[in-house]
């Protein structure tokens, strides 16, 4: 197995594979790390994973770490770009296979990733999302190169359908020799431990967060003559759009003052349009289409109630954003959602039309009777729950733990794959690990590490990026990042 040896500013560290050895891969700094975030999902495509990577990276940069991000090219966005505070992003020219995830053969990405890891003197690889093929590739190659690895799982999976079975098997292979795993809720942790057959001791729970300065209440934007229910989500099956199509006609018939404001785009939008047409609700059901992140708050503050109909969710950031804007939240009781907000701020329902209608009627009664807490009071409570600085601090502790661990040498890694992943999958990926190791040797022969120029650090202790934006101020970059839901 390869060892990572520290190098100076003028000399890149060597990543020479050595099958029988392992070593401490942390560099000569004890308090800061060179971190590479890897995922197929990043700006300009935006969602929960993308926002998590961006915000976490900004806070880690603020704490003195060097952070870069690696993702695939999005249209004309290729090569190297810099975001706020010098966050360096590599947009790799890899082919997208499905739903913004790249195709993988394990080998085609090794030359590019190896070059980046050596050039940037990376010590910790932090991959995100089970759906990202590039994240799994980076974990696999990092272990071949002798780098410490961390993986954050943002999703919940079942165990019965074919898609879940295949994804769970891939996750078992990727995580069996990963140093540490992070989940966004305790429900997500239980799910991941079962799916990947992991030791719970190497799995930590670190939730998502929101920037409370981006989601502040504005009661004057509400129309008190009506009661507005806001829905902001992708209009897909997993988000419960079919449930929403059953709720709208039932409650609109019962409450003439009830209006629905729906933001988001997806294949299930046609169902909502059919409901609006069938029941002649054009003046009471407004479909806004895809929203950018900078517009979400302006939509939320127009409502009294926020409705979430998700059928599965590891950690729902949307309900935290809505509560931060002072809305009463009504949500399905699935996945990690019951862990997100206290009972005083959320009405939990079963994922059925009847239960959600009952929950909404309870919230409507509170609005009519004036018993809801003031939006400003709700905001002041929520803003103390989840902050990105706290997430970064807890993630930093994971990095400290990981940096003191040794990477499995090749023979132990092969034993782990065979014993942990089953006789067929285990031997197959053990063979791939050996081939990847031989390919790495070939690449090092073709282009030795010493021939790869060391990049100037935009972030970290030796950062060349001089213009630092404080996180407690509004930044233009936030306006550039769009979050289509």
Swiss-Prot record:
Start-end of Low complexity biased regions: 11-23
| Membrane topology type | Single-pass membrane protein
In its UniProt record, a GO molecular function of this protein is: phosphatidylinositol N-acetylglucosaminyltransferase activity
Catalyses:
a 1,2-diacyl-sn-glycero-3-phospho-(1D-myo-inositol) + UDP-N-acetyl-alpha-D-glucosamine = a 6-(N-acetyl-alpha-D-glucosaminyl)-1-(1,2-diacyl-sn-glycero-3-phospho)-1D-myo-inositol + UDP + H(+)
Where are the stretches annotated Disordered? Answer: 1-26
Which CDD domains does the entry link to?
A: GT4_PIG-A-like (cd03796)
- Please, which domain of life does this record's source organism belong to? Eukaryota
Gene Ontology process terms (BP): cellular response to leukemia inhibitory factor; GPI anchor biosynthetic process
GO cellular component terms given for this protein: endoplasmic reticulum membrane; glycosylphosphatidylinositol-N-acetylglucosaminyltransferase (GPI-GnT) complex
Ranges annotated as biased composition (Gly residues): 1-10
Topological domain ranges for the Cytoplasmic compartment: 1-422
Q: Which residues lie on this side of the membrane: Lumenal?
A: 444-485
**Which Pfam families is this protein grouped with?**
Glycos_transf_1, PIGA
Per UniProt, the keywords (alphabetical) are: Endoplasmic reticulum, Glycosyltransferase, GPI-anchor biosynthesis, Lipid metabolism, Membrane, Phosphoprotein, Transferase, Transmembrane, Transmembrane helix
Q: What is its EC number?
A: 2.4.1.198
Residues that the record marks as modified (Phosphoserine) are 21
**Where is the protein localized?**
Endoplasmic reticulum membrane
Pathway field of the UniProt record reads: Glycolipid biosynthesis; glycosylphosphatidylinositol-anchor biosynthesis
Where, by residue number, does the polypeptide cross the bilayer?
Answer: 423-443
How does this protein assemble?
Answer: Component of the glycosylphosphatidylinositol-N-acetylglucosaminyltransferase (GPI-GnT) complex composed at least by PIGA, PIGC, PIGH, PIGP and PIGQ, DPM2. Interacts with PIGC, PIGH, PIGP, PIGQ and DPM2. The latter is not essential for activity. Interacts directly with PIGY; this interaction regulates glycosylphosphatidylinositol-N-acetylglucosaminyltransferase activity. Interacts with PIGQ.
Q: What does the similarity note say?
A: Belongs to the glycosyltransferase group 1 family. Glycosyltransferase 4 subfamily.
Q: What is this protein called?
A: Phosphatidylinositol N-acetylglucosaminyltransferase subunit A
Q: Which organism is it from?
A: Mus musculus
């Amino acid at each position: 197995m390869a060892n990572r040896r520290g190098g100076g500013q003028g000399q890149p560290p060597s990543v020479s594979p050595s099958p029988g050895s392992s070593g401490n891969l942390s560099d000569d700094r004890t308090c800061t790390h060179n971190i590479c975030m890897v995922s197929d999902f990043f700006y300009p495509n935006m969602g929960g994973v993308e926002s998590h990577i961006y915000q976490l990276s900004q806070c880690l940069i603020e704490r003195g770490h060097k952070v870069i991000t690696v993702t695939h090219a999005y249209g004309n966005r290729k090569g190297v770009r810099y975001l706020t505070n010098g966050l360096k992003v590599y947009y790799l020219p890899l082919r997208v296979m499905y739903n913004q995830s790249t195709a993988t053969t394990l080998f085609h990405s090794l030359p590019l990733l190896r070059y980046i890891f050596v050039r940037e003197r990376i010590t910790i690889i932090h991959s995100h999302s089970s759906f990202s093929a590039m994240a799994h590739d980076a974990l696999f190659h990092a272990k071949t190169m002798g780098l410490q690895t961390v993986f954050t799982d943002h999703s919940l999976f079942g165990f019965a359908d074919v898609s879940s079975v295949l994804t769970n098997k891939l996750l078992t292979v990727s995580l069996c020799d990963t140093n540490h795993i992070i989940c966004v809720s305790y429900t997500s942790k239980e799910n991941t431990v079962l799916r990947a057959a992991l030791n719970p001791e190497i799995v930590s729970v670190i939730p998502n967060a929101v920037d409370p300065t981006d989601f502040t209440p504005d009661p004057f934007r509400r129309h008190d003559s009506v009661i507005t229910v806001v829905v902001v989500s992708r209009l897909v099956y997993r988000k419960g759009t079919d449930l929403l199509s059953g709720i709208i006609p039932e409650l609109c018939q019962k409450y003439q003052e009830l209006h629905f404001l729906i933001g988001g785009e997806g294949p299930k939008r046609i169902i909502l349009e059919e409901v609006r047409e069938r029941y002649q609700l054009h003046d009471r059901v407004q479909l806004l289409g895809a929203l950018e992140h900078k517009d979400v708050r302006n939509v939320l503050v127009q409502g009294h109630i926020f409705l979430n109909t998700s059928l599965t969710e590891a950690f729902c950031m949307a309900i935290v954003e809505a509560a931060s804007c002072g809305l009463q939240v009504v949500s399905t009781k699935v996945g990690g959602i019951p862990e997100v907000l206290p009972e005083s701020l959320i009405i939990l329902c079963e994922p059925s039309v009847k239960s959600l209608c009952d929950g909404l009627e309870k919230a409507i009664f509170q609005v009519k009777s004036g018993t809801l807490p003031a939006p400003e009071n709700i905001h002041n409570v929520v803003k103390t729950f989840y902050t990105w600085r706290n997430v970064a601090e807890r993630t930093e502790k994971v990095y400290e733990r990981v940096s003191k661990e040794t990477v499995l040498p090749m023979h132990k890694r092969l034993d782990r794959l065979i014993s942990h992943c089953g006789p067929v999958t285990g031997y197959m990926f053990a063979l791939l690990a050996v081939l990847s190791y031989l390919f790495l040797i070939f690449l090092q022969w073709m282009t030795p590490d010493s021939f790869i120029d060391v990049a100037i650090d935009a972030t970290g202790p030796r950062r060349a990026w001089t213009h630092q934006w404080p996180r407690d101020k509004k930044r233009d970059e936030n306006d550039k990042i769009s979050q289509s839901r």
